[in-house]
């Protein structure tokens, strides 16, 4: 019982071990298909405790063992909160030139087949993160202080962990009572000292575009983005030492349906509610640009993660055999894996050559029919029940269905490609296999 698994990571042992000691490491290694959340990270790999939340109100408390702490060779943790024997030893040894043999030894009554997909995911994720980090450091080795709005959302949580494991300091800007290390942010009237000591801002906050496009909903979508962004950009302009102002944006700026037209950052904006909102959203960054701050608008495609967005909605349908293409399935889907989006945000902060709008999409868009076939194949389920066109209209209304569910946008990441940016998951099959722990299948 239990499992021992090894792989070689293309980074030296000190760097691999050090990565595990940084805040956010445990968040980066939790498989996205598992209903697990980090409640508290361990303050130390020698004797700290990490607490994870599980379904049903259960908690997984991993207590690190002082007797096994041997940097940079090993550390171990044991489960203390549940009646399940569990000891997880993490071992690191040199392997050739500037590489590390990483070995996980899990001692538990659970069979290896239950553990394998999780452990394989952790190794692949660790390798990918360290490879991407090496590329980021080739751009800039600076360690920055980055203020982040929307840090508790799907993207913000993952991005915070990526930045902190990269050696940066993250200052969450929050609208509730701030905890240690956070700052209170009033979107309509931010405090003059909010950005003091900050090198860069990543502004993610904004109301979800999901749901029916009622007048009230459209007002919330617009007002949660444009005015708060302008106020934050004005504050950035008045703050000494700020190097970069990076804001979320969306490919909705190109309009809901441009046929087979290839859309790049140089393409004209489209028509429709979302195009109007995104244009105003991007224009709201003007005060920062006018002050000489490098400003980047990350025009985000359809983010792929089982933890949120479209994929979270589709997964249960496909797992029960009820998934299928939407209408005729000819709509273009400009998708992006979550980790690739995070890498783009990190690059936007670090790369002095990057400014203005940047399409954050994978280099290979797919049609809706191809997307649904691929998802079904990865989940090993059929995709034989097409969703009629009126289905999204029932849920989202005519305008919402046209602008979201039925949108067709052939968007390419021309500026990133021109900059030599490397994607972790450039094609859909590999991305979905990684996200669902189906690599090698």
Predicted feature descriptions by range:
Residues 143-144, 351-399, 433, 439-440:
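Mid/C-terminal beta-alpha module of Rossmann-like enzyme folds, strongest
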Residues 27, 32-35, 41-109:
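Hydrophobic-ligand binding "helix-grip"
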Residues 315-324, 330-365:
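Alpha-helical substrate-binding/gating segment
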Residues 289, 297, 301-332:
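NAD(P)-dependent short-chain dehydrogenase/reductase
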Residues 1-43:
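Hydrophobic ligand-binding cavity/cleft-lining segments
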Residues 183-228:
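NAD(P)H-binding glycine-rich loop region in Rossmannoid oxidoreductase-like domains
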Residues 144-166:
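N-terminal Rossmann NAD(P)H-binding glycine-rich loop of SDR-like oxidoreductase domains
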Residues 230-272:
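Conserved Rossmann-fold NAD(P)-dependent oxidoreductase catalytic core, especially the SDR/UDP-sugar
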